[in-house]
């Protein structure tokens, strides 16, 4: 059974510096070690987002491209919500190409959009 308190304390320290690299590391780790149902997955999402939305928010530009495709832990509406990611303005939406999500935004550079497309193909 998923122990919320235990999970919270185990990732609180790694998340304390509130950096994109810590977020990436934690998500990569969780993708390797956690197999759970959708309800538990949702709880994990909320806990991670809560920890990383404290103090200084994560800059979207610092997230690794591959982290955008770890949708088993993060859902796009949560990750892209301006409440949690404040580096870019609202108006982001997402589409699908080759069964993988791609983020589109008028606020992202053309180069970054190209990288996302390239990763998808």
Swiss-Prot record:
Principal location listed in the UniProt entry: cytoplasm
Record keywords, A-Z: Cytoplasm
Expression sites (tissue/organ): Specifically expressed in chronic lymphocytic leukemia (CLL) cells from patients without immunoglobulin heavy-chain hypermutations. Expression is detected in all CLL cells and levels are similar in patients before and after treatment.
Origin superkingdom: Eukaryota
Subcellular location: Cytoplasm
Any GO CC annotation of this UniProt entry: cytoplasm
Keyword set includes DNA-binding: no
Signal peptide residues on this chain, from the entry's feature table: none
Coiled coil: none
UniProt miscellaneous comment: Tridimensional modeling predicts that it may interact with the IL-4 receptor.
Protein name: Chronic lymphocytic leukemia up-regulated protein 1
Species name: Homo sapiens
Gene: CLLU1
């Amino acid at each position: 059974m998923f122990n919320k308190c235990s999970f919270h304390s185990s990732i609180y320290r790694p998340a304390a510096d509130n950096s994109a690299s810590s977020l990436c590391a934690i998500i990569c780790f969780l993708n390797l070690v956690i197999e759970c149902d959708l309800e538990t997955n949702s709880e994990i999402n909320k806990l991670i987002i809560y920890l990383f939305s404290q103090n200084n928010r994560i800059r979207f530009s610092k997230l690794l491209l591959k982290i955008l495709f770890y949708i088993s832990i993060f859902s796009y509406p949560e990750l892209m919500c301006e409440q949690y990611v404040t580096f870019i303005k609202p108006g982001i939406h997402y589409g699908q190409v080759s069964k993988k999500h791609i983020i589109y935004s008028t606020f992202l550079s053309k180069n970054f959009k190209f990288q996302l497309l390239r990763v998808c193909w």
